[in-house]
A protein has these predicted regions:
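ATP-dependent NMP and nucleoside kinases share a basic, alpha-helical "lid"
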Residues: 28, 38-95, 139
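Cys/His-coordinated zinc-binding microdomains
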Residues: 86-88, 101, 106-107
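Residue-level signature of catalytic and energy-coupling elements of molecular machines
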Residues: 20, 34, 63, 72, ...
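Short, small-residue-biased leader/transition segments that mark boundaries at the very start
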Residues: 2-4
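NTP-dependent small-molecule kinase module
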Residues: 108-166
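Loop/turn-to-beta-strand initiation segments
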Residues: 29-33
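Conserved alpha-helical scaffold flanking the Walker A/P-loop in AAA+ ATPase domains
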Residues: 17-27
Length: 166
């Protein structure tokens, strides 16, 4: 049986909310934390808001890194993984010395199931259907910031640091 991730589906809300809420109660989150890829749905966002409010906290910033679907499909379908040592590469951005062979251990590289274009397209469909409404949700709360994700990594990072005032 394929796992949820390999089918391009989202993990059930209840499980994710419980895990995140437990995690942000830890001592190392006392001075703040960044949630990457969560919440992904309105019910998750509402559950997070409720849980944070119970601790006298709230979401201070929501950042949407905007990247066209075509760019995402191209980026992800270019990723390659070594199943032997876990190293990751990209055929354009992080190429190997010998095409298709891991620089670290010499094993053959693979395109993971969740990076295949058809799986990425399914994940993007799920994103647009379930996650897109969060943009409106956080805009209405006055905490949404948008960053152009087509720029190079350093520029995207700098834009996020500027937003967070870090």
């Amino acid at each position: 049986q394929m796992c949820i991730r390999d089918r391009g589906l989202l993990v059930p809300d209840e499980l994710v909310v419980d895990l995140v809420v437990d995690r942000v109660k830890a001592d190392d989150c006392r001075n703040g934390y960044v949630l990457d890829g969560f919440p992904r749905t309105i019910p998750q966002a509402e559950a997070l808001d409720k849980a944070l409010a119970a601790n006298g906290e709230k979401v201070d910033y929501a950042i949407n890194v905007e990247v066209p679907d075509e760019n995402i499909i191209n980026r992800m379908s270019g990723r390659r993984a070594c199943l032997s040592c876990g190293a990751t590469y990209h055929i354009v951005h992080i190429p190997t010395k010998v095409e298709g062979i891991c620089d670290k251990c010499g094993a053959e590289l693979v395109l993971r199931d969740d990076d295949k274009p058809e799986t990425v397209k399914k994940r993007l469909d799920v994103y647009h259907e379930q996650t897109q409404p969060l943009i409106d949700y956080y805009t209405d709360k006055g905490v949404l910031n948008e960053v152009d994700g087509t720029k190079d990594m350093d520029e995207v990072f700098s834009a996020i640091v500027d937003i967070l005032g870090a």
